[in-house]
């Protein structure tokens, strides 16, 4: 028997559950202590909803497209995209904290525990997704006063879609963080990923309008995983299922997560930190 099976053989399901609970609790406490992170997570989509939507309401009229059964206001259309945007930014913020923990040596301490790496990273991913769910539902509560009122069942039906999209976007952030060597470089890389994904999607405008203006950009949007996260959320809010988007989100989530687990190096960043300390 190899060393790896011997290392994990004595761990029970209860011990795995305790480990998961501890990681989720730690991430929850970190989020509560970073109140400005919670405020900024809400301010960003609210600015788009109250200002951007008001300015473009008359310019970008929305025709009857699935899952909608009638004409809708522009702010109603962009609401699912803003929910996905909250999850996208939260996934990148969670990955930023992982880069910080790695540079400080905290992740190395965590990953030398008897639990397998895939479980520890998956637990971090689940914790980040739960935080994003809190942000999303607070935003939905505020948006309700702005006459964004999906069917009551939609608030429950959208939960699985939010979990899947949150896991996919969090796994993407984790994969990116595994390739970033230093904390200082992550902000630039994060912006390079976030804004192209957000704007080259169906979050702000229907894809049929993009196709009319630029067929090439339309195909880019179709290949964008964020587009399918938005559409999965959009359909689920109205009690419907977009099978293609579900398949793409699940497939990308698996690919991103496997890539992050294989590429993650808990020691990366430590030599640079030691070098800076020696210079001081």
Locations of the language-model features?
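Short, membrane-interfacial amphipathic segments enriched in basic
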Residues: 2-25, 169, 213-227
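Junction motif at the cytosolic side of a transmembrane helix
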Residues: 4, 237, 247-280
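Membrane-interface helix starts
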Residues: 25-47, 241-247
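Membrane-interfacial helix-loop-helix junctions in multi-pass membrane proteins
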Residues: 30, 202-255
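Hydrophobic alpha-helical transmembrane segments of multi-pass membrane transport proteins
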Residues: 47-52, 71-146, 192, 197-198
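Short helix-capping/hinge motifs at transmembrane helix termini and TM-loop junctions
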Residues: 52-61, 89, 143-151, 180-182, ...
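Transmembrane helix segments
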Residues: 54, 58-60, 177-223, 227
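Alpha-helical transmembrane segments and their short interhelical loops
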Residues: 117-191, 240-263
């Amino acid at each position: 028997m190899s060393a790896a099976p011997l290392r994990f053989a004595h761990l029970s399901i209860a011990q795995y559950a305790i480990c998961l609970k501890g990681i989720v609790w730690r991430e929850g406490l970190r989020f509560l202590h970073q109140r400005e992170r919670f405020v900024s997570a809400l301010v960003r989509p609210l600015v788009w909803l109250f200002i951007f939507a008001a300015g473009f309401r008359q310019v970008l009229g929305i025709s009857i497209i699935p899952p909608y059964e009638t004409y809708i206001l522009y702010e109603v259309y962009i609401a699912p995209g803003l929910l996905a945007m909250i999850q996208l930014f939260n996934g990148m913020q969670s990955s930023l904290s992982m880069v910080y923990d790695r540079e400080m040596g905290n992740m190395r301490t965590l990953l030398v525990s008897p639990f397998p790496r895939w479980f520890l990273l998956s637990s971090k991913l689940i914790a980040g997704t739960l935080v994003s769910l809190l942000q999303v539902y607070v935003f939905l509560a505020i948006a309700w006063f702005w006459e964004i009122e999906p069917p009551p069942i939609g608030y429950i039906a959208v939960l699985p879609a939010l979990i899947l999209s949150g896991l996919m976007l969090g796994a993407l952030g984790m994969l990116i963080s595994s390739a970033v060597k230093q904390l200082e470089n992550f902000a630039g890389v994060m912006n390079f990923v976030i804004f192209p994904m957000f704007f080259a999607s169906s979050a702000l405008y229907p894809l049929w309008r993009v196709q009319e203006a630029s067929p090439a950009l339309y195909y880019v949007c179709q290949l964008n995983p964020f587009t399918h996260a938005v559409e999965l959320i959009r359909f689920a809010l109205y009690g419907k299922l977009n099978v293609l988007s579900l398949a793409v989100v699940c497939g990308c989530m698996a690919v991103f997560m496997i890539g992050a687990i294989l590429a993650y190096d808990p020691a990366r960043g430590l030599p640079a930190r030691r070098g800076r300390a020696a210079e001081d």
